[in-house]
Amino acid sequence: MFGIHSLAGVLLLVIVQRQLASPLQEAEDNSSLETTDPLLEDLMGVSNVKRHSEGTFSNDYSKYQEERMAQDFVQWLMNSKRSGAPSKRHADGTYTSDVSTYLQDQAAKDFVSWLKSGRARRESAEESRNGPMSRRHVDGSFTSDVNKVLDSLAAKEYLLWVMTSKTSGKSNKRQEDH
């Protein structure tokens, strides 16, 4: 019996050791994982450092490019100012264009009122007697063939307007007569 009790004791001892050994192994496995975590963190840190240095390089390069572009722009401004060529500002051009448009509209209104007043026939008769006079356009240029064509078109338009206005006037007189 002593042999059976010893055998039972040895088996119990082996079972207890296994039971105790498995939590220790799990603890060692956890500790080995914990030790690998800092290693992984170190590796991640190294890759982060690499990324940071790449970002620093690209950031420095971007700053260099911006500074270079600014220097090129300043150099271009200085060169364009030295050339002495007259520069035209957009605001001046817009103002000039607006004034020109206004003057052209005013000239067209004056021309139509001149045609309506009937002075056109009298002046053209005087011109044919005295010879052609050089008239100037609003902007100071001499009258060209295009302006002469436009004048004749305006005269035709005026005559058409006069003819249609007289027709409506005759119809009013006819209605009053009846």
Curated annotation (Swiss-Prot):
InterPro entries this protein is in? Glucagon, Glucagon_GIP_secretin_VIP, Ppantetheine_attach_site
The UniProt record describes its induction as: Produced in the A cells of the islets of Langerhans in response to a drop in blood sugar concentration.
Does Zinc count among this protein's keywords?
no
Q: Identify the stretch annotated as signal peptide in this record.
A: 1-21
Top-level taxon of origin: Eukaryota
- Please provide the Gene Ontology terms (biological process) for this protein: response to starvation
One of the record's GO molecular function terms: hormone activity
Q: What does this protein do?
A: Promotes hydrolysis of glycogen and lipids, and raises the blood sugar level.
Name of protein: Glucagon-1
The organism named in the record is Oncorhynchus mykiss (Rainbow trout)
